[in-house]
Amino acid sequence: MSGRSVRAETRSRAKDDIKRVMAAIEKVRKWEKKWVTVGDTSLRIYKWVPVTEPKVDDKNKNKKKGKDEKCGSEVTTPENSSSPGMMDMHDDNSNQSSIADASPIKQENSSNSSPAPEPNSAVPSDGTEAKVDEAQADGKEHPGAEDASDEQNSQSSMEHSMNSSEKVDRQPSGDSGLAAETSAISQDLEGVPPSKKMKLEASQQNSEEM
């Protein structure tokens, strides 16, 4: 209970303080600064003077002040509303700037995306290079086979040439042998009777035909 009573006292004190402040504000509202002449002299002083107008005028003034305050608040509210509008404009500008900032980012992304296919295109090129290398390696291997085949062909051609040369050598040797045989036979025929010469010539012709 003590806590509640303390709270009630503080509330009542606060209310009293608020009332005093409001009364002081009302008194101040009843005062205003004016140029006032001092006594019978011509001196004029600008100081706070209580309002000397009747209460009706005070009420009207208070109403006018309230209206002015409302108008001022309304004027301030458009300013506030305009300030949010300006904030919106700033937001739009910031959005535009962010979009402008994002557009270079997009351009960078597009530029990054465009180099990205280049590695991909480079990969096929690497593949083609690998294929070319493989083809070259195969070509290197195949040329070995081709060299072997060329060697075989050359060997076969050499063999053919050797065989042909041997045949050629054999033919002249055969011809020379035949010539020697014919010469020997002719020499033999010189000391042989004509009947035997005919037989030998016939045998030579048969051997030549064979």
Curated annotation (Swiss-Prot):
Name this protein carries in UniProt: B-cell CLL/lymphoma 7 protein family member A
Cross-referenced InterPro entries: BCL7 (IPR006804)
Domain of life: Eukaryota
GO cellular component: chromatin; GBAF complex; nucleoplasm; SWI/SNF complex
Entry keywords, A to Z: Chromosomal rearrangement, Isopeptide bond, Phosphoprotein, Ubl conjugation
DNA damage as UniProt keyword: no
Residues bearing PTM Phosphoserine: 203, 207
Comp. bias (Polar residues): 74-84
A matching Pfam family: BCL_N
Region of interest called Disordered, as start-end residue ranges on this chain: 48-210
Transmembrane segments: none
UniProt disease annotation: Chromosomal aberrations involving BCL7A may be a cause of B-cell non-Hodgkin lymphoma. Three-way translocation t(8;14;12)(q24.1;q32.3;q24.1) with MYC and with immunoglobulin gene regions.
Similarity remark: Belongs to the BCL7 family.
Biased composition (Low complexity): 108-125, 151-165
Linked residues for Glycyl lysine isopeptide (Lys-Gly) (interchain with G-Cter in SUMO2): 199
Organism: Homo sapiens (Human)
Biased amino acid composition, Basic and acidic residues: 54-72, 128-145
A GO biological-process term: neuron projection arborization
